[in-house]
Amino acid sequence: MNVHTAGPRHAEKTRHTATPQRVQPSDDLLRLASNVWPRNITRDETGVACIAGNKLTDLAGEYGTPLFVIDEDDFRFRCREIAAAFGGGENVHYAAKAFLCTEIARWIDEEGLSLDVCSGGELAVALHASFPPERISLHGNNKSVAELKDAVKAGVGYIVLDSTTEIERLDAIAGEAGIVQDVLVRLTVGVEAHTHEFIATAHEDQKFGLSVASGAAMAAVRRVFATDNLRLVGLHSHIGSQIFDVAGFELAAHRVIGLLCDIVGEFDPEKTAQLSIVDLGGGLGISYLPDDDPPPIFELAAKLGAIVSNESAAVGLPVPKLMVEPGRAIAGPGTITLYEVGTIKDVDVSATAHRRYVSIDGGMSDNIRTALYDAQYDVRLVSRTSDAPAAPASIVGKHCESGDIVVRDTWVPDDLKPGDLVGVAATGAYCYSLSSRYNMLGRPAVVAVCAGQARLILRRETVDDLLSLEVR
């Protein structure tokens, strides 16, 4: 996989193949693959795509574009499915970093899941939504004193320790508050999952966690046990994101259980009795393209459960509670981004071939993932039908950046024209949450749809919002 860290400079060439690599016949250009698009998406007799009974053309007319459209039933279905697979919602901590607002926090609460936050801002949103603090865990490699104090004051269930400095800091804060805070220690287990370099998080040379191999993790455990105000209840590992192969989780679990065995062997039962949680983090992959084939969630959960059980039995330990932290797997598939087509250019790339650049009214400010990770997406005409032949194209944004590409090397109907609406699938995770105001474009609105109804859950940013931080 090519690494694309920030996009090329102005006037540099962007990477393209001579012709698109994902060849699709023209009669497939309107297909909305069920493994990629929201559960409740259909087309009406005129070819207009609808989600949960809401025409996308109507939503664009009422709320404007770009527009994030969330299939609420899809989101809730995935919450329930993952909770059932992992033995209950208390074992599933939704990763707020994927996408969070107060409405999403309420859905997570209503479906009985727990919540993983990584900043004071995410914690504040959760508390604003009246999310039960005892079902919140706080992560982060550089939590500030203020964030730790806010978490302790709120009464969060767990704080995941990421450094030895944080151990002393949190012990003092908990002592001042007169409580004993439950904590997990985040481990670096040396497993690099088959994922992009920037989203693989458990190899040794990286900013997260404490290394098992170097002894730093065991040293941190000893320091936690030596405190007066921290109670170690589990070990945490996270090996990456968008993972399809369970082998990485198996090796991670083996090393986590190995450390747990060492801890039990070194400390008396009074200290280790409460050490009952193994959190294997998130990273469950989803389909971004029709040919993607991630493992079914129940199959994956059964394999992870068996891994933890077998590893524990092999060293004679009671089976710990298995916890996970899915974000993308819940939020990603049920959301699309709706764009209006603007400028269309045909550019000669050889004596016999050209590429069509289809410009949309959003871009890297609402979806940085293609530029950042070389992400791939499924894009479709959603405002009408078409029987035109396929044309090779790239879907590009309106920003002053040649790397501003949302979908690279795809196919579109040859009659695609300005004013048409296109949808990009599976944009519910790490699109709005990574969005920016680049070129002073306000962030898009977010609309939830369910049973024929649509409601705004995040309004579109306006020029007034863009000017709101100015001091004169």
Swiss-Prot record:
The keyword Amino-acid biosynthesis applies. One of its GO terms (biological process) is lysine biosynthetic process via diaminopimelate. Pathway: Amino-acid biosynthesis; L-lysine biosynthesis via DAP pathway; L-lysine from DL-2,6-diaminopimelate: step 1/1. The active site is at C400 (proton donor). InterPro entries: Ala_racemase/Decarboxylase_C (IPR009006), DAP_deCOOHase_LysA (IPR002986), De-COase2_C (IPR022643), De-COase2_N (IPR022644), De-COase2_pyr-phos_BS (IPR022653), Orn/DAP/Arg_de-COase (IPR000183), PLP-binding_barrel (IPR029066). SUPFAM superfamilies: Alanine racemase C-terminal domain-like, PLP-binding barrel. It is an enzyme of class 4 (lyase). Its EC number is 4.1.1.20. Signal peptide: none annotated. The modification N6-(pyridoxal phosphate)lysine is found at K97. CDD domains: PLPDE_III_DapDC (cd06828). Residues 1-23 are annotated as: Disordered. It comes from the Bacteria. One of its GO terms (molecular function) is pyridoxal phosphate binding. Substrate binds at R328, R369, Y373, E401, Y430. Keywords: Amino-acid biosynthesis, Decarboxylase, Lyase, Lysine biosynthesis, Pyridoxal phosphate. Pyridoxal 5'-phosphate binds at G283, E325, P326, G327, R328, Y430. Its cofactor is pyridoxal 5'-phosphate. Specifically catalyzes the decarboxylation of meso-diaminopimelate (meso-DAP) to L-lysine. Homodimer. Belongs to the Orn/Lys/Arg decarboxylase class-II family. LysA subfamily. HAMAP family: LysA. PANTHER family: DIAMINOPIMELATE DECARBOXYLASE (PTHR43727), GROUP IV DECARBOXYLASE (PTHR43727:SF2). This is Diaminopimelate decarboxylase. It comes from Mycobacterium leprae (strain TN). The gene is lysA.
